[in-house]
């Protein structure tokens, strides 16, 4: 994989408005799981959430989250498709109130990767394969990220 100005060339780019300037060095990758609606896969609902285009009429659950302004740097779909929403040079809004090793605000110094799925279901081999390539690329670009 190639990264240029914070963008992975092999990723499908969908630019989210939900980001701001990053003022800290990157030293962490945060991996989340997401599905919208919960436990449902294979739609554009996650994209629409990160792009502020989620339609609250499409599912009752969406009425609860319609006002969220969130994003992630990356999404890896069940099929292994890699999407990027925010440049790694910018701060995505993926971690909310958070801390790592006593340092608050993980968004300030981390890259967020979403895997389409849930905490109680298995991920797909294609997702793991893509995740390995992506994390290797990011760790090469940002050497302060350590395996932990």
Task: Give residue ranges: language-model regions.
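Active-site-adjacent loop/helix surface patches within enzyme catalytic domains
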Residues: 1-22, 28, 33-144
């Amino acid at each position: 994989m190639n990264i240029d100005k914070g963008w992975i060339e092999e990723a499908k780019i969908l630019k989210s408005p939900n980001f701001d300037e990053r003022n800290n060095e990157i030293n962490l990758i945060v991996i989340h799981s997401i599905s919208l609606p919960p436990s449902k896969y294979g739609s554009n609902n996650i994209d629409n959430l990160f792009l502020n285009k989620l339609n609250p009429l499409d599912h009752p659950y969406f009425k609860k989250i319609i006002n969220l302004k969130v994003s992630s740097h990356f999404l890896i779909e069940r099929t292994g498709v890699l999407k990027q929403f925010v440049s790694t040079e910018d701060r995505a809004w993926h971690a909310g109130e958070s801390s790592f090793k006593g340092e608050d605000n993980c968004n300030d110094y981390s890259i967020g990767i979403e895997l389409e799925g849930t905490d109680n279901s298995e991920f797909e081999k294609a997702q793991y394969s893509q995740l390995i390539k992506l994390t290797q690329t990011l760790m090469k670009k940002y050497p302060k990220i350590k395996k932990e």
